[in-house]
Amino acid sequence: MYIEMVDETGQVSKEMLQQTQEILEFAAQKLGKEDKEMAVTFVTNERSHELNLEYRDTDRPTDVISLEYKPELEIAFDEEDLLENPELAEMMSEFDAYIGELFISIDKAHEQAEEYGHSFEREMGFLAVHGFLHINGYDHYTPEEEAEMFGLQEEILTAYGLTRQ
């Protein structure tokens, strides 16, 4: 899985970038999404607040914002078109590969790690996996959706080795 990571805060260590890369690759493997691409941007609470207002019409910072990529253009090509034009086939596969972007608030991650009594590493892993599941179509609006998403989230974090302790 290709993951573009940007640290707008200047506060994310190389080790944390590496952990985020590894846990997202691990989650992608669990979901069969190894051939996908995504972006992760680490932001401050101030930037998170701006993004939350812009994308979710919510006037406060949040821990992770997940923007699932859904191409606006519905372009239909038949198999013959793609066989005759390899560049077109390659371009279409690139559109299919990109699944979305996460914005993770470093400030919120620190606050929540302290609040929940676990490590910053665990909180960052949790936020990355939580956001990753959102951009792959998981949600928690209903009790059934919540049970499915949170169960998978915990399964991934535990299998990776990021437990609550």
From Swiss-Prot:
Its main location: cytoplasm. GO terms for cellular component: cytoplasm. Its EC number is 3.1.-.-. Zn(2+) binds at residues 130, 134, 140. It is found in: Cytoplasm. It comes from the Bacteria. The keyword Coiled coil does not apply. Its cofactor is Zn(2+). Pfam families: YbeY. Keywords: Cytoplasm, Endonuclease, Hydrolase, Metal-binding, Nuclease, Ribosome biogenesis, rRNA processing, Zinc. InterPro entries: MetalPrtase_cat_dom_sf_prd, YbeY, YbeY_CS. Binds 1 zinc ion. The keyword Plastid does not apply. GO terms for molecular function: metalloendopeptidase activity; RNA endonuclease activity; zinc ion binding. GO terms for biological process: rRNA processing. Single strand-specific metallo-endoribonuclease involved in late-stage 70S ribosome quality control and in maturation of the 3' terminus of the 16S rRNA. Belongs to the endoribonuclease YbeY family. This is Endoribonuclease YbeY. It comes from Streptococcus pneumoniae serotype 2 (strain D39 / NCTC 7466).
